[in-house]
């Protein structure tokens, strides 16, 4: 039987993301940009297994996380067990941000 102490000290699932219970989740992109969003501001999330890719949509754009452990990150994320994520080249291969286009920037 697992004790409460053991639950609090379980090993990290990956070095690519930081465990914790956040109010703000931080995404560090491949380009070095850092985006922070309130955890509950997520509009939509989808994991696509055939591409090992997770899409997290926020008001300003979509965070795209790719890699063999993207689904495990998603599982931790939805349980509020992840504070930040960045590519480590092994478990998470890429973290990118696709910003929403502003109305005035759209080409007609």
At which residue positions do the language-model features occur?
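Anionic N-terminal interaction surfaces
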Residues: 1-20
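Phosphoinositide-dependent membrane-docking surfaces
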Residues: 37-48
């Amino acid at each position: 039987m697992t004790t409460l102490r053991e639950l609090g000290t379980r090993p990290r699932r990956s070095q690519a993301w930081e465990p914790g219970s956040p109010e703000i989740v931080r995404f560090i992109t491949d380009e070095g940009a850092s985006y922070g969003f309130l955890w509950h501001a997520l509009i939509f999330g989808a994991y696509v297994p055939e591409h090992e890719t997770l899409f997290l949509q926020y008001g300003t754009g979509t965070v795209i996380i790719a890699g063999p452990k993207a689904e495990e990150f998603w599982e931790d994320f939805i349980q509020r067990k992840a504070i930040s994520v960045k590519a480590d080249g092994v478990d998470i291969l890429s973290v990118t941000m696709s910003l929403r286009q502003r109305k005035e920037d759209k080409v007609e």
